[in-house]
Amino acid sequence: KYVKLGNAKAIYESLSLKSDKIEAYYNETENSSMDIANVIAKKNVVIEDKKMKIVGGNFAEYNVKKDYFKVNGSKLQLTSQMNILRSNNRMEYWRSKGVAVATGGAEAQKENEFIVKADRLVWNLHEINKKITVKKIIGFSNVSIRSNNEVAFSDKGIYNNITEVCKLFGNVRLQRGDSFLTGEYAEVDLKSGISKILPAPKKGPNESKVRALIEKETKE
């Protein structure tokens, strides 16, 4: 075990971890060398990785083998390019898988274009020119998306950053001014401002894999 106090900092590849206290735990290998297994950070946690930044953490744990971060705090914020992800409870980040998850009062914002809220939000990330950007946003439970001219509600939502279309599933309600539409599935085009209630499509395999990943890590 290694402990550092006061403006502590740990660096691993492109990843940087800062906090008031850092504890590193080692595993002894067959050739008697020591490999870092877990890193724990306490108070004023700041995590940076290729222009992506997480702040507001009171406690963070990094599993080196899984390349997985778990951060706790009441005012967590992840910033990547023009996008912001917030949580009042927990944030998780799988570096190698390109997935970030906010649980508890989750909120995703893209400048002044829209705000998505849900009990749990998932960011699918990808790297372009050594910068991490948001490819897709998935919301679970009590989902709402607010744009400049409309508010939409559903049980689940999937936003594609490339097409700028948000797909809403289950108990959908679209509200614009005093008028509203209801249904089980809708597509909200945030670029054109056009929203449609449509027949529900079949469940996509990518969303199933993301949910399985989240549930597996949550149980461990």
Model region roles, listed by residue range:
Residues 1-220:
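Mature-chain termini and adjacent capping regions
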